Amino acid sequence: MSSDPGSPGPGSPPSASPAAPASSPASHLGHAPGTGPEPLARLAPLALGALGIVYGDIGTSPLYALRDCFSGAHGIAPTPANVLGVLSLVFWSLIIVISVKYLAFVMRADNRGEGGILSLLALVVQRGGGERSAARRPLLLALGLFGASLLYGESIITPAVSVLSAVEGLGVATPLFAPYVVPIALVILLALFLVQRHGTGGIGRVFGPLMAAYFLTIAVLGVRELVGNPSVLRAVSPVHAVSFFAQNGWHGFLVLGAVLLVVTGGEALYADMGHFGARPIRFAWFGLVLPALLLNYFGQGALLLRNPGVASNPFYYMAPQWALYPLVGLATAAAVIASQALISGAYSLTRQAIQLGYSPRMEVVHTSAEERGQIYLPGVNVALLVGVVLVVLGFRSSANLTAAYGLAVTGTMAITTCLAYVVARERWGVRRAIALPVAGLFLAVDLSYFGATVVKVAHGGWLPLTLGVVLFTLMTTWKRGRELLGQKLRAASLRIEDLLESFGDNGPQRVPGTAIFMTGNPEAAPTALLHNLKHNKVLHEQTVLLSIATEDVPHVPAAERVTVESLPLGLRRVTARYGFMEDPSIPDILKRCREAGLPFNVMSTSFFLGRETLIPSKKPGMALWREVLFVWMSRNSRAATAFFRIPPNRVVELGAQIEL
């Protein structure tokens, strides 16, 4: 786009506003602002919808969590004491991590109703908190970006491990299916990614009822076993968890790396808060999901007490023989739904990264005219598909993948705790004496899980770490490259007021029509305007300087979208503001300008864009290899005309070479 300081081109989104307002106090109470407590008639449908989007990931954990505790790479013998100890860890993990940490505390840290690690990061990096806070901001920014990078790894691993673990039930039904598990899983995953371009609006309506049926089914399976051995419920006492570590020592600590699989998906509860609100998500958790999960886990424990030989797959061995194939079908459907949630989450995360300036522009396709949140990013879809296929072919089974899965999850959980603590202190004003012990407890749990998975780096944990480092490097390189480019452009810029004053009262010759000059810095004269004056020596009758800024909030109210200012010589300065969950659109901006009294005739309007040709150099600022990477990312970014929906036949591009 424009070659001005902070401009969104080439290949960048609009510049993020550094001083957006903090989320409203009302939003800290657990619902999106303005919604208030939902009546039951509205709460139930929202909770059902949340079942189909939010709880797919955590809902499929019973397929493999206890299996890995007792038969994984670091599995422990399924003795009665060990079974009770593991069940106690499972119970308290679900209570402390999901029920208390995420649902009671983290979900209060919403950014005007939106959740997720980038929304949380946007709250953290907003100006405020004094010099000490500003000094910590780079570290917090790095933490948040690495957490987001790990989520991309989870978006690759979740579809692979969920679908593989579901299809592996066929091997329990009959060993004849064992050689076909990987091919069947690949076919299902390929179909899942191929339908993404068509959107999931139609089939999405059945996700909620399907997941409700799934949770009821696994609850019934658990009850069948508990009726025969209710003594397993003693594991609710934390004494069994303490005894488990006391008796097993280091081995018991390693098993904690498998126990954490029961809380995978916790981040999804927070990330999807903007779709449903906090209260429906909590209602679904305490009303159905938590009871169903606990009944199933304790049912698996009862089965293991009765028959330790089924440790290789206790979930499927709970089912009677006649129900195995239907259960495999239902579990596969749940795995697909869990995968869809992570894929959609990757799309949303990428759009946020683009708008906040951490990623170059990409094609964003809206798959629903009614739901603005239903988007499809072809580039991300292809990358995820390639990653998932390679992971399935490389690891071959869900048991081999869970080590990789755990590291991605625990890293993000720990980072979320740190960022939420900063928000509590600096945004809410919570005293350190209160915030620190609470955050310290959560962080101690998170780091315990993380420590138990770090030792598995050689067994698959290297995968999310590698993906995280690669994506972190890409995002920070893009951000730093844009900052360096902005600095160079600012040094060569000219204030628009100074330029106009230099013409005196008459100014250059005017020609009919309207010219819109895109700029990222509303105070500076766009380079495209300077080139036009230098070579053509004319101004259009109506000349507009348009800048598009992204605020650190998810949505900008319509009344605050566009501001119009008058400049000397009849020029106008238009500033359009968007949230990081919104897509900038030139047609939308022109419509709002007309409403503000600034008419446009698109057929007589020309859009002047600057296009920079970037040249890597050995000058100070960024390593040469990162400059080369930044130039490559810039060249492969989506064209500004397509990203901002500018009529391509009305665009004039003026280029310039810039040495980094």
Where are these regions (language model features)?
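The structured alpha-helical core of multi-pass membrane proteins
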Residues: 2-660
